[in-house]
Amino acid sequence: MERRIGLELGPAAFDENFTTEGLTEREACIGDIFEVGDATVQITQPRSPCWKLARRWRVPDLAIQFEETGYTGWYLKVVETGLVASGQQMKLVERPHPDWSVSRATKIRYRMPEDRKLAEELANIESLGESWTTKLADRAETGTQPDSTPRVYGPNLPDNNGDEA
């Protein structure tokens, strides 16, 4: 992503709590359970990039670029609390949905709005986050995709001259 947007990004560049090395959205799957330190965490959904990242890094379409690449990051829920320290390994202990990588889920949600069947399959994964489950189930039922403009651009919408508002 750094090469694509022409910026050097450091740790926590996107306000993340965990930064992983060697585990990308192509390998990580919805429902994956990890032990890290004394805690146990589970991937619940891809991150939905928003306008705040674009504003922070001054790249108006940054959220769209993340969606296009599939490198959105993901959300973890705490299954078991415990102490965690920087530098500790995340050990995969369970992968209940090996066919549902984070990047595949992102592609289905944002780049395949016409595929109601896959939206329904993804929505039926019990460990998927509630907001994603609701939106995908609605899409599977109605065939409509909500407008992502407010999330993606927010107050950063360009005006009619192509300048940032």
Language-model features: locations:
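Metal-cofactor-dependent catalytic cores
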Residues: 1-165
